Structures are given as structure tokens and as C-alpha cells.
């Protein structure tokens, strides 16, 4: 089963947009993500609907970030991309006749609910400015390593 990568891809795009003070065209984003510009426009429209980006048509136009990274949580973006399913596993039969299957389903359902709530809480508490900071730390470390290799 293929993983849904809309969340990570849009987080990737938003962080790049925050670093560069220019509009990003759908073509530019599609090249970055190695996908179709139509897919980009469809997904970015969800971010626009939630007030994270805006778009300008015509020459010099494109998508621009209009909300501060400190005001956007991972959960906000998760919602904006359509709340993709978190788990690929589940119960085959929601109304089993077998009591063994019933208790298995109940145990799994409870575990899934608890795990999903834990993840949702984590997504809500993590702002995009933290990711931007973490990137900067990694970037600085990368540059320092490259410079030390040259000396």
C-alpha cells in the first residue's frame, strides 16, 4: 500500500516558501516534488482555503506564504490537505458474528483511537517555525562540516 505523502510534501513546500521571498509557481513546486502541476494546484488550494497561502495569476505570479510559520501547526496543515488516513490497518468486519473477532476489534479500535489522539496532540503542539529552526540548525551543521573538510 502506498503511503499518503501530502502532509510531508506540503510542509516541505511551506518551509521552502518561508525561506525565499518570491512566489512559487505550480510548475516550480511540481518540479521540486516530482509531481504534476495539476496535483500541486489542487493541494495548494486547500492551503489557500485555510489562509496559509495566496495565489497570483500571470507573469511574476504564483503561490506565496501569507501566514507566519509560528501561527501554523502541523495539525493545521494536516487538516488543510484533507486529513489523510493515519493508519493503513483496521478491522475487516465491523459487526462480527464471532465473539473472538469482536474482542480483537475492540482492543484494536481502542489502541487506534489512543494512538491517533497522541499523534493529533503532537501535530497540534508543533508549529512550523520549530521545523524552520531545526532546519537552520541542520543547515549550519552541514555548512560547518563542509568548511572543515576544506581545511
Label for each model-derived stretch:
Residues 1-33:
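Extreme N-terminal segment that seeds HTH/winged-HTH DNA-binding domains in transcriptional regulators
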Residues 69-94, 112:
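Conserved segment of winged-helix/HTH DNA-binding domains
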Residues 50-66:
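Beta-hairpin "wing" of winged helix-turn-helix
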Residues 96-151:
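C-terminal regulatory/oligomerization modules of transcriptional regulators
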Residues 12-15, 75-79, 121:
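Generic alpha-helical structural context detector
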